[in-house]
């Protein structure tokens, strides 16, 4: 019967049913073979007993029974081997069917994913990602520039002072010494005198710068 509870059996159910029938047949063949092997041993024992008693006619008849019994044992062994081969084929069919069902499910899932993954949308997402990344890079660069501008003036001034000090040290000069050589005046000055003092101070600074420049030129010529 290929119907189960009013519905048609699936291929998997039919395979399981046939597999159970084959296993049952192999068990029955094993039981019959064991009975024949037990009978074979009994016949051999009877043949030996009759031979000792000299009943050769009975021995000949029992020998024929022994031959038939051994032939049946070989047939049962062969039948069981054939049934086992069929059982293995059914098992292979079950495995192949299971693999086919699994592949069917995977194929269906792949189809669903392919339908969900729309290329234009993916391209749009990637373009938007690249745009946002560029904006982020630009903002980061602007922030770095702002930080450099805020910190750069102080660093540049310190670096410039360090360079001037190094040059003067190499020349054996001192900025403090140069400034101390400038002429200075004391006492209270009028507004006009203050103006003259400022002019004199500016002139003295200019002379000091000119003198320093002249020394640098002489060092270069040396």
Curated annotation (Swiss-Prot):
ISGylated in a CHMP5-dependent manner. Isgylation weakens and inhibits its interactions with VPS4A and VTA1 respectively. Pfam families: Snf7. The modification Phosphoserine is found at residues 184, 188, 190, 203. Residues 12-53, 195-222 form a coiled coil. Widely expressed. Highly expressed in brain, heart, liver and kidney. Residues 179-188 have a biased composition (Polar residues). Residues 179-198 are annotated as: Disordered. It is a peripheral membrane protein. The modification Phosphothreonine is found at residue 185. Keywords: Acetylation, Coiled coil, Cytoplasm, Endosome, Membrane, Nucleus, Phosphoprotein, Protein transport, Transport, Ubl conjugation. The modification N-acetylmethionine is found at residue 1. One of its GO terms (cellular component) is amphisome membrane. The keyword Zinc does not apply. A motif (MIT-interacting motif) lies at residues 210-220. It is found in: Late endosome membrane; Cytoplasm; Nucleus envelope. Residues 56-222 are annotated as: Interaction with VPS4B. The acidic C-terminus and the basic N-termminus are thought to render the protein in a closed, soluble and inactive conformation through an autoinhibitory intramolecular interaction. The open and active conformation, which enables membrane binding and oligomerization, is achieved by interaction with other cellular binding partners, probably including other ESCRT components. Probable core component of the endosomal sorting required for transport complex III (ESCRT-III) which is involved in multivesicular bodies (MVBs) formation and sorting of endosomal cargo proteins into MVBs. MVBs contain intraluminal vesicles (ILVs) that are generated by invagination and scission from the limiting membrane of the endosome and mostly are delivered to lysosomes enabling degradation of membrane proteins, such as stimulated growth factor receptors, lysosomal enzymes and lipids. The MVB pathway appears to require the sequential function of ESCRT-O, -I,-II and -III complexes. Probable core component of the endosomal sorting required for transport complex III (ESCRT-III). ESCRT-III components are thought to multimerize to form a flat lattice on the perimeter membrane of the endosome. Several assembly forms of ESCRT-III may exist that interact and act sequentially. In vitro, heteromerizes with CHMP3 (but not CHMP4) to form helical tubular structures that expose membrane-interacting sites on the outside whereas VPS4B can associate on the inside of the tubule. Interacts with CHMP1B, CHMP2B, CHMP3, CHMP4A, CHMP4B, CHMP4C and CHMP5. PANTHER family: CHARGED MULTIVESICULAR BODY PROTEIN. This is Charged multivesicular body protein 2a. The lineage of its organism: Eukaryota, Metazoa, Chordata, Craniata, Vertebrata. The gene is Chmp2a.
